[in-house]
A protein has these predicted regions:
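N-terminal subdomain of nucleotide-sugar transferases
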Residues: 1-57, 61-66
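Nucleotide-activated donor-binding/catalytic signature segment of Leloir-type glycosyltransferases, i.e.
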Residues: 267-301, 305
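Conserved donor-binding/catalytic core segment of Leloir-type glycosyltransferases
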Residues: 4, 177, 215-234, 240-243, ...
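Short alpha-helical donor nucleotide-sugar binding micro-motif in glycosyltransferases
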Residues: 78, 301, 309-314
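Membrane-proximal helix-turn-helix segments that form the acceptor-binding/catalytic region
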Residues: 118, 134-175, 189
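Short hydrophobic beta-strand element within catalytic cores of glycosyltransferases
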Residues: 339-342, 352
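Aromatic "clamp/platform" in nucleotide-sugar-dependent glycosyltransferases that forms part
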Residues: 322
Length: 421
């Protein structure tokens, strides 16, 4: 059985096999785990096609990797590779549509894997952000064309375009795979003629073994970990609003945010940078207004090992996003046994049971509810240990590499049997 994958980024395995500069192990992290599990399947011939900045190919551990710059290469590549099935990871990127058309023209079945549900991500992108930060004038759009920033109206336009591409790709889909009640419902609406196959994700191997999280005596200085805060869907603004209630009881509490801090090039350029990065400006002003600026720290970008350590050093993991499907960061935190507090949106309730495996709060923008959930964990006599252990047990089932690989192979076999009875 020969399966061709299309992925939107150059995976670390592909970069190594093709002799390219190292790719980030953050991008496409769910694919690296799934790929590692599938390599052991003796009856599977796997070709992984990545979209990158230069053409390259190579083979490692029995997997053939191809990196292409131009989607015009897809049709001849299919003729050369002659796979039995094309598996497209993601629905909203331009090469997905090109590959789907090329595969159908060659008479090949196409399986789409739903990642985020862009329809809902676009709808909730700027929830809770004041209008004055969401709209930028003509001058700032002109500057943005020369020196790109992060104007929120541009970001909204981009998300809306991704949602439209997702809808177009799924409208003609015959086979889709997902993993939550949320994406299943989305596929029922967006891909009404498709057969839906459930299949969970396999995460980065580093998070399955080694030291687990343990509660510590944090006294007045608990650490709250937010895995991303650079754009409004991740809802940093609501976390900032929740901080005063936490600080009222734990005066030295710290919010750690994985990623780069807001750009600062000194007082002369600061007004321009602030206008070019309005969401960061809003969060900066909000933190200053609430008196919590000194309690917020950015870690800088973290590779897998550093991110693992960040989980272990935290006391509570936060995921207050306005929309998520099956966030890898939540799965990783659960695998390590870290107590989790998350918004009850999208696919999150399919991953974590409220009250036993972590705490979910209803409205993502409800800062009071978020603060109460965080304080409930911090107040618990065991520091959230019991919830963390239950979360780890659940995550070991959800992200079981061998089972997920077997499920995916069964999906391939079922589709091919239907196509060639």
């Amino acid at each position: 059985m020969h399966i061709l994958w299309l992925v939107r980024t150059t995976l670390p395995q592909a970069a190594a096999a093709c002799g390219l500069a190292g790719a980030s192990d953050v991008s496409g992290s769910w694919l690296t785990g799934q790929l590692a599990a599938l390599r052991a399947c003796p009856d599977l011939h796997l070709t992984v096609l990545c979209v990158g900045k230069e053409d390259a190919d190579g083979t490692a551990d029995g997997v053939h990797y191809r990196v292409v710059r131009d989607t015009a290469a897809f049709a001849p590549l299919l003729q050369a590779e002659r796979p039995d099935l094309v598996h497209i990871w993601g629905t909203e990127f331009d090469p997905a549509a090109v590959m789907a058309d090329a595969a159908r023209a060659s008479g090949l079945p196409v399986l789409f894997s739903v990642q985020g549900v862009m329809r809902d991500c676009a709808a909730h992108l700027c929830d809770g952000v004041p209008e004055k930060y969401r709209r930028s004038g003509a001058l700032w759009h002109t500057i943005d064309k020369i020196i790109p920033g992060e104007l929120l109206d541009n970001m909204q336009t981009s998300f809306d375009a991704l949602a439209a591409k997702e809808a177009a790709a799924l409208a003609d889909a015959r086979y889709v795979t997902g993993r939550t009640a949320f994406d299943r419902a989305a596929c029922a609406a967006l891909a009404p003629h498709a057969r839906y196959y459930p299949c969970n994700e396999t995460l980065r191997p580093l998070f399955y073994t080694g030291t687990l999280w343990h509660a510590r005596d944090f006294a007045a200085a608990p650490v709250l970990l937010l895995p991303q805060g650079n754009y409004p869907l991740k809802n940093l603004h609501t976390v900032i609003k929740a901080l005063p209630a936490v600080l009222a009881e734990y005066g030295d509490a710290e919010l750690r945010i994985a990623g780069w801090p807001p750009l600062d090039k000194g007082p002369l350029l600061r007004p321009v940078i602030d206008r070019m990065f309005p969401y960061k400006l809003y969060c900066k002003r909000l933190a200053a207004q609430l008196g919590v600026t000194e309690h917020i720290r950015y870690t800088g970008p973290l590779d897998a090992a550093a991110m693992r350590q960040a989980y272990l050093e935290a006391d509570v993991f936060l995921l207050p996003s306005g929309c998520e499907n099956s966030p890898n960061s939540l799965g990783e935190a659960m695998l390590l046994g870290l107590p989790c507090v998350a918004s009850a949106v999208g696919g999150i309730p399919s991953m974590l049971a409220n009250g036993t495996e972590g705490l979910l709060y209803g409205d993502a923008l409800d800062a009071d509810a978020l603060a109460r959930a965080v304080l409930q964990v911090l107040h618990s006599p065991d520091g959230g240990t019991a919830m963390g252990r239950a979360a780890r047990a659940r995550a070991l089932q959800t992200h079981d590499a061998a089972r997920n690989a077997a499920d995916l192979l069964h999906i391939y076999e079922s589709i091919l049997q239907e196509e060639h009875p």
